[in-house]
Amino acid sequence: MENEEWKVSVWICQEEKLVSGLTRRTTCADVVRVLLADHNEKQAEEGSMLMGEEGSMLLGPPQCYCIVEKWRGFERILPNKTKILRLWTAWGEEQDNVKFVLVRSEASLPNIGPRSAEAKVVLSKESPCHQRTLSKTSTGPTQDKQRRVVRKAFRKLAKINRKRHETLPKESSSVEKMETLVHLVLSQDHTIRQQVQRIMELDREIERFEARTHFDRMKMHGVNYVQETYLVGTVSEKGSASDSNPPSDQSSQEELFADYAQKCDEVLLLQEQISRQEEAMEQMTVQIQEELNKRWMERRQEELSSKEQESSLSDSGADQGGDESQLLLEQEQVKTELSASLYIGLRLNTDLEAIKADLDYTQKMWDDKEQELQSLLHSLNDLETSGCQDLAEISCEDTSLGVTTTGSPTDSWVEKDLGRPTNCEANDEDSDTGLSSMHSQDSDSGPVCESLV
C-alpha cells in the first residue's frame, strides 16, 4: 500500500488528528482507544485548569465513544468491529468528501439521514453507571442493524467501483477502435495509390511492348504485313516475292525501319521537351505576375508613405513654399515609378526573348525531324516500288519461258528486252502517283502480256 492508505484523519473536538500505523486488522475501537489516550496525555501534560467543558467531553471508558462517518450531508455510526482501513480504501475517489468524527455514543443519532450540523456532545446529568446500563440496553438491538447498513454500504461501494472500472475499458476500447479505423483508412488509401501507379506503369509497358512488336513485324514481314495477312488471295504470291527478294534489299529495309523507329523516339522526346517548355512558360508567367503584384504593392505603399510625408510637410511648413515641396515630391514619385516600370519592362522583355528563342529552336528541330521522316517515307515507297518491279520481272521471265518453248533463245531474250521498258514506264507512273504496292502490281501485269502477244 501507499503511505496515504496508512493514515486516516479523525476529527475530535473540532480538531483534526491523523491516525497512522493502521493495518487491515485495525478496528474503530482501536482508533477510539488511541485517540482518547492521546488526548488525555496532552491534557495531563498541559496541566490546564479548564477541564470543565473540553475535558469532560472525553471522560469515561472507550466504550462510551464511537466514530461517525459523514459523507455529503449523510452520517452513520460505525460499529466498533469495523475495519476502518478497508472502509477508507473502499471509498476510492470519494475520500475527499468523507470525514470521520469521534463523538459520544449517546450524542449520536440512532437513525441514518441527512444532517445539517455536526454531532454535538450532550452531557448527561445521571450517574455514569446508569449511563452505561442505558447505553448497553439501547445499543444492543441496533448493532445488527448497523452491521447490515455497513455491509450494504460496502456492497454499494463495490458496485460503484465495478461500474467505474467497466466504463473505463469501454472508453479505451472505443478509442482504440477509432484509431484502428483511422489506420485502416490510411493504409487502404496508400495501397490504392500504389495500385493506381502500378496500373499506369503497366499501361506504359504494354504500349512499349506493342510498339516494339509492331516494329519487329514490320522488319520481318514488311510495312503492309496487316494487309498481307488479311488478303488471303495474295498470300502465296507475297511469299514467293519475299523469297525472290535479294538480301541487300532486306538489309536496307531493316536499316530504314531502324532509322524510322529512332526518329519516332526522337519525335516523342521533342514532344516531351515542348511540353516541358510550355510548363516553364506557365511558371514564368506566374512568377512575372507575382513580381508585378509585388512591385505594385510596394509602389502603393510608397505612395501612401509619400502622401503621409506630404501631409506632415504641408502641416509643418504651409507658410514656407508648400507648393514647391509638393511639386518636388511628385517629381520624385514619378521618377521612381518610371524607373520601376522600366525595370519590369526590361525584365519581361528579356524573359520573352529567351522563351521565343527556345520556341524557335524547338520548332526548327521539329521541322528537321519532320523532313527526315518524310524522306524516310519516300525511300520506303521507292523500295516498295522497286520490289514490285522485281516481282514483275520475275513473272515476265516465267511467262516468256512458258510461251516461247519452240522458239530460239535469242527471241526470248529480245522479248524480255522489249518487255522491260514498258514495265519501267508503268512503275514510274505508279511511283509518281504514290499508289500502294498492291495497285502497282496490278498495273505491271497488263503491259507485259501485251508485249508478249
Curated annotation (Swiss-Prot):
Chain segments annotated as coiled-coil in the UniProt record: 262-295
All copies of domain Ras-associating, residue ranges: 1-107
Compartments, as annotated in UniProt: Cytoplasm, Cytosol; Cytoplasm, Cytoskeleton, Microtubule organizing center, Centrosome; Cytoplasm, Cytoskeleton, Spindle pole
A single BP term in Gene Ontology: signal transduction
Location of the region described as Disordered in the Swiss-Prot/TrEMBL record: 299-322, 402-453
Main location: cytoplasm
CDD domains to which the protein is assigned, alphabetical: RA_RASSF10 (cd16132)
Keywords for this protein: Coiled coil, Cytoplasm, Cytoskeleton, Neurogenesis
Compositionally biased region (Polar residues): 402-411, 433-444
PROSITE patterns listed in its UniProt record: RA
Pfam families on file: RASSF8-10_RA (PF21712)
Matching SMART domains: RA
Superkingdom field: Eukaryota
Gene3D superfamilies, alphabetized: Phosphatidylinositol 3-kinase Catalytic Subunit, Chain A, domain 1
Biased composition (Basic and acidic residues): 299-310
Disulphide bridges, residue numbers: none
GO cellular component: centrosome; cytosol; spindle pole
PANTHER family in the cross-refs: RAS ASSOCIATION DOMAIN-CONTAINING PROTEIN 10, RAS-ASSOCIATING DOMAIN CONTAINING PROTEIN
Function comment: May play role in regulating embryonic neurogenesis.
The name this protein goes by in its record: Ras association domain-containing protein 10
Organism: Xenopus laevis (African clawed frog)
Gene: rassf10
